[in-house]
UniProtKB/Swiss-Prot annotation:
PANTHER family: NEDD4 FAMILY INTERACTING PROTEIN 1/2 (PTHR13396), NEDD4 FAMILY-INTERACTING PROTEIN 1 (PTHR13396:SF3)
Gene that this sequence comes from: ndfip1
Origin organism lineage: Eukaryota, Metazoa, Chordata, Craniata, Vertebrata
Organism of derivation: Xenopus laevis (African clawed frog)
Highest taxon in the source lineage: Eukaryota
Protein name: NEDD4 family-interacting protein 1
Entry's transmembrane regions: 108-128, 135-155, 164-184
Length: 212
């Protein structure tokens, strides 16, 4: 009798613990996937409406450039846009003394102008060869042009040189126009050179070639 009562009591305790364990197991179990998908679908739709970018596909994300493409892009990144120009263009505020000596001033221009005008071609060669500035050489060109006009007029209207232009007046006009063009060329080019310090003062350093 005692054994039967103990076994029945043991079975009764086992029956009482089973509902509790089943309830705990059901509470610890994760919810089904269908319920999660239904609850979170609204959240995903809300993110899509906000305009967040979608991640790329697996093929796009895992596509790597080839070796040649990687080397080409690396070489393009190392090559400067304008090679070898940094040394030529140096910012400065105004022309330095060396540039001013190469341009010259009004005094040198007038000196070489009168040398070429008074001493003709001898003064032209002396003033053109002895001066290295633009003002001196343009002054020599302008003075030689005016000297050429002077001698053409002297020969044309003087009684000491008869018969020089008889029947060849076109030659007189050629030399007259040539002297006038040389005279204007010297003055105009020197005026342009004089304006260069003002025009290039705010620009990078520029090398200018003077063609006489």
């Amino acid at each position: 009798m005692s054994e039967q009562s103990s076994s029945s009591r043991y079975q009764q305790l086992q029956n009482e613990e089973e509902p509790g364990e089943n309830a705990q197991a059901s509470a610890d179990a994760p919810p089904p996937y269908s319920s999660i998908a239904g609850e979170s679908s609204g959240l995903f739709d809300y993110k899509d409406e906000l305009g967040f970018p979608k991640p790329p596909s697996y093929n796009v994300a895992t596509t790597l450039p080839s070796y040649d493409e990687a080397e080409r892009s690396k070489a393009e990144a190392t090559i400067p846009l304008v090679p070898g120009r940094d040394d030529d263009f140096v910012a400065r505020d105004d022309f330095d003394d060396a540039d001013q000596l190469r341009i010259g001033n009004d005094g040198i221009f007038m000196l070489t102008f009168f040398m070429a005008f008074l001493f003709n071609w001898i003064g032209f060669f002396l003033s053109f060869c002895l001066t290295s500035s633009a003002a001196g050489r343009y002054g020599a060109i302008s003075g030689f042009g005016l000297s050429l006009i002077k001698w053409i007029l002297i020969v044309r209207f003087s009684t000491y040189f008869p018969g020089y232009f008889d029947g060849q007046y076109w030659l007189w006009w050629v030399f007259l126009v040539l002297g006038f063009l040389l005279f204007l060329r010297g003055f105009i080019n020197y005026a342009k050179v004089r304006k260069m310090p003002d025009n290039f003062s705010t620009l990078p350093r520029t090398r200018v070639l003077f063609i006489y």
